[in-house]
Amino acid sequence: EVRVLDSLEEPVHRGGVKPAYLDERIDFRRGDVRDEATMLAALDGVDAVYHLAAFQDYLPEFSRFFSVNVTSTALIYELIVREKLPVRKVIVASSQAALGEGLYRDADGRAVLPGLRRDEDLKRGVWEIQPGPGQAGPLAYQPTDETVANPQNCYGMSKIAEERAALNLGRMYGIPSVAMRYSIVQGPRQS
């Protein structure tokens, strides 16, 4: 048995309409993952949670990134613990954006965690990350341990916070929890 809670918001869901491809046997509920009563009803009788809800955009709605992506995750754990729900596992959808650009080494072998790419470089068509002050170029990308996180936008910051909330709350309360770092999940049926 599968239950889905979704707000059906634009632009992911054009017209706010439930996708026609959903199997009719799915227990579909429309609602906001940040609403306690809605979330509690959605969790009733559930033994595994796949928390895929996320706000992603480049608009300066900074607080919305955290309320949807982090607060809703914390709410799931809060309800599981407070209501003693029989949830056996929680899986949250994170993102490659939680890592930022990853780890580089400069020409002198020093580790570099770069910040945002410079607008002036991008306007000139320079896509490679450039050395910063005190760094010898060129920079060479290094395989990056997943514990190295340096997110560069609100979405990435909220996803690393979501990961930490899920993994730490899961550990604290004995709820097996996993954060999956997806990469560019877009296109038809992305939701």
Where are the regions that the model predicts?
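Substrate-binding strand-loop-helix patch
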Residues: 188-191
